[in-house]
Regions:
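Extended hydrophobic packing segments that form well-structured cores
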Residues: 56-58, 63, 74, 97, ...
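A structural signal for small-residue-enriched, beta-sheet-centric alpha/beta enzyme cores
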Residues: 3, 90-96
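A general structural motif
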Residues: 13-20, 39-45
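Generic recognition of cysteine residues
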Residues: 8-9, 40, 57, 86, ...
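Single conserved hydrophobic/aromatic residue that forms the stacking wall/gate
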Residues: 1-5, 9
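A charged nuclease-like catalytic/ligand-binding cleft shared by nucleic-acid processing domains
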Residues: 16-25, 135
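Hydrophobic alpha-helical bundle architecture
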Residues: 26-87, 99-103
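Short, Lys/Arg-enriched charge-dense amphipathic segments
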Residues: 12, 85-92, 132-135
Length: 146
């Protein structure tokens, strides 16, 4: 029987597609190998994006099926996975991947659109969070806190 925690881990690994994992990095560790690197740390929104930024990410793609109105230290593109969420929280969204499920775009078309958005963001286009002035951090507290 699968636990909720193991389901979360499986979903995270599946986001890497068929690419082999080349390295597992410590929290905020810098990648030294080309390819899919996994970063140790919690998977919640603000802590994980803070860790990715500390690890050297310049642009973060954050997929969500619920939506969280936060902004990370690095430009963070919120990729929404369903149309319902986009309808209710459009000002939090950067990219609607739900168009694949609704048939409005093919997977290849949506992938091209997202790739173009990443290039635009890396070139200075503001994300939804940046336009709203959101730039939060959350440091992972591993161990005893006094």
């Amino acid at each position: 029987k699968s636990s909720a925690a193991s389901d979360v881990y499986k979903r995270q690994v599946q986001k890497g597609g068929s690419a082999p994992i080349v390295d597992v990095l410590p929290y905020a560790g810098r990648a030294t190998k080309h390819g899919l690197n996994m970063l140790c740390g919690p998977g919640n929104d603000m802590v994980s994006t803070t860790a990715l930024t500390a690890a050297g990410c310049h642009v973060i793609l954050f997929s969500t099926g619920r939506g969280t109105p936060f902004g990370a230290p690095a430009p963070t593109l919120k990729v929404f996975t369903n149309q319902r969420l986009c309808d209710h929280k459009a000002n939090w969204m950067d990219f609607n991947a739900g168009v694949i499920a609704t048939g409005e775009r093919t997977l290849d078309e949506a992938a091209h659109d997202l790739y173009q958005l990443v290039l635009e963001t890396a070139s200075g286009k503001l994300t939804s969070a940046e336009r709203r002035g959101c730039h939060e951090i959350s440091i992972w507290k591993d161990g005893v806190c006094l």
